[in-house]
Amino acid sequence: MSDETRVGEAAEQAATPEKIRKGSARRERGNRTGFTTGACSAAAARAATLGLLLSEVPDTVICRLPNGQEQAFAVTDGCVEESSGLAHAVIIKDAGDDPDATHGAHMTADVRLLPDRAGEIVLKGGFGVGVVTKDGLGLEVGGPAINPVPRRNILDNVRAVAGELLDHDGLEVTISVPGGDEMAKKTLNARLGILGGISILGTTGIVRPYSTAAFRASVVQAVDVAAKQGQTSVVFTTGGRTEKFAMRQLPDLDESCFVQMGDFVKAAFSSAIKHKLPTVYVGAMVGKLTKMCQGLAVTHAWKAEVDRDILADSAREVGAPDDLIEEIRSAETARFAAERLASLGLAVTFHRQLAIKAIRSLKDKYPGNYRLAVLVCDFEGQFICRVNEDEAL
């Protein structure tokens, strides 16, 4: 996968992963697709360019998305200042049913004539569009966080309608997002080295609700950034609570070392191995830890249930009574086992057994020249144990 594809497919704004469980009203609210920041920016730029050409910004604009689809967008706040050769247009982003941090953003384009620069189109980032400060994103450091696919799409849409405007003059297109600096605080942009605003993203132009492909790509991207910064360790966690726990346990590591892999174990480890990172940590609780013991590439509940035999066998190995072992074998959740064993004072030894099995499974599935350690916490994010690979192999 190319840098352009990988970065473009990263979760729209690489939003902090949030677990929305099956059955939740938020999860069940629908599958309506929406549009990426890149598609909305291209539509705004096309509308503003038409404004310069026609002396009036249209109320609706037809934009060609990166996937080739022709899509109508409603245009707001359109205006033209003919005396200064400037046109302005806004598209309000609709992310569909996806819980997108940038839903409702006012994607704004200002298009200005560049006298005597025939055929030239210059694309800039304005307020609310992040600035790239770190390598690893496939973008120029110091430039705007406008990814390659939407960058081309914006320029293509402008050129498609500019017509005679480009015969003698050029065009400067500035994309901005009012409030983008605040939206960015709800994303992982700062950790990736994108500061001051959101990213302009999207390889197809379409946002699909709860896209697992986007989440997986964001994991790969985060590892790329850590490696390009010269980090020698990466810490994979299964969510926000385990990440906070891992950060407390490893306070000397830079924030960029911490990657919420969610359910995407294979994507995380494959990326770390590709970059030859010498040290890998995993932070997890009992459920995901058990699924790592199972060797699952994706640990989501929809992919596979927790193997209760692993839980029961581990309980037996640490001395749990026979009746409890059978209860664990027929229980609905891994949490049941963890809590019952904790009540018997067996929490540490039980979780150590699981961590040892997880290390063996992970090293078998993802061989490479790296050292692995597993950090385990309880459901409140409190430390239970740490197991290094030399204790397991």
Swiss-Prot record:
Key words of the record: Cobalamin biosynthesis, Methyltransferase, S-adenosyl-L-methionine, Transferase
Pfam families cross-referenced by the UniProt entry: CbiD
Single Gene Ontology BP annotation: methylation
Catalytic reaction equation(s): Co-precorrin-5B + S-adenosyl-L-methionine = Co-precorrin-6A + S-adenosyl-L-homocysteine
The EC number(s) this enzyme carries: 2.1.1.195
Region (Disordered), start-end ranges: 1-35
A molecular function GO annotation: cobalt-precorrin-5B C1-methyltransferase activity
SUPFAM superfamilies given in the database record: CbiD-like
Cysteines paired by S-S bonds: none
InterPro entries reported in the protein's UniProt record: CbiD (IPR002748), CbiD_sf (IPR036074)
Signal peptide boundaries: none
Pathway recorded for this protein: Cofactor biosynthesis; adenosylcobalamin biosynthesis; cob(II)yrinate a,c-diamide from sirohydrochlorin (anaerobic route): step 6/10
Listed Basic and acidic residues bias regions: 18-31
Record NCBIfam families: cbiD, PRK00075.1-1
Listed HAMAP family: CbiD (MF_00787)
Entry similarity comment: Belongs to the CbiD family.
The name this protein goes by in its record: Cobalt-precorrin-5B C(1)-methyltransferase
Native source organism of the sequence: Dechloromonas aromatica (strain RCB)
Gene name as annotated: cbiD
